[in-house]
């Protein structure tokens, strides 16, 4: 399975999260997932909230359009971004 797939007007992205990183960034592929480093610690949902905000900014959508479908409590997540207005260059290469 690919890290990023299109489902109608949405993107479904399989992620591997690295919390407590030095900066927020999309790192690249990690196996069959897209690795994302975020600065927030994995405590009380802070990392999930920060991830949602970061991805919303990268794809230029409202935070409510970024939904964690699977993996709320782990590093491996599946998210859905509805109506992305912008596809970051480092992500576009991995879309199937």
From Swiss-Prot:
It comes from the Bacteria. Coiled coil: none annotated. Pfam families: DUF167. One of its GO terms (cellular component) is cytoplasm. InterPro entries: DUF167, YggU-like_sf. SUPFAM superfamilies: YggU-like (SSF69786). Belongs to the UPF0235 family. This is UPF0235 protein PC1_3453.
